[in-house]
């Protein structure tokens, strides 16, 4: 079993300056979680050199909140993560609609490919920005 804190690194999404005046990095599990959030929150088609990167979530967030909406979001997230995050194993996505708030609670459970016995979790709330 490898030490994933040394194995994986990415540029920190906050783009803070490090002590050596270089862009800071996120390491290990944090880099994988940041990557997942980047995949989920990037609108498909917004990257000119890879138009398939990201999820089509904004259209669903403006639809009527139904079980079908939650299922579509769940499938979109699962497909995008499987296509763009190779460090993930045992992926499970669960989307829970909150009808009164017009929001979706997204729970993502996964394991890192180098450590498949440890299950990690990300939980986030998605909402349209134009709520009445």
From Swiss-Prot:
Places the protein is found: Virion
Induction: Expressed in the late phase of the viral replicative cycle.
Recorded superkingdom: Viruses
Keyword Secreted part of the UniProt annotation: no
Keyword Cell membrane set for record: no
Record-linked InterPro entries: IraD/Gp25-like
Short name of one Pfam family: GPW_gp25
Keywords annotated in UniProt: Late protein, Viral baseplate protein, Viral tail protein, Virion
Cellular component aspect of the GO annotation: virus tail, baseplate
Summary of subunit composition and partner proteins: Homodimer. Interacts with gp53 and with the (gp6)2-gp7 heterotrimeric molecule; The gp25-(gp6)2-gp7 module is involved in sheath contraction. Part of the baseplate macromolecular complex which consists of gp5, gp5.4, gp27 (central spike complex); gp6, gp25, gp53 (inner baseplate); gp7, gp8 (intermediate baseplate); gp9, gp10, gp11, gp12 (peripheral); gp48 and gp54 (proximal region of the tail tube).
Record-stated family: Belongs to the GpW/Gp25 family.
Known role: Baseplate protein that is located next to the tail tube (inner baseplate). Involved in sheath assembly. The gp25-(gp6)2-gp7 module is involved in sheath contraction.
Name the UniProt record assigns to this protein: Baseplate wedge protein gp25
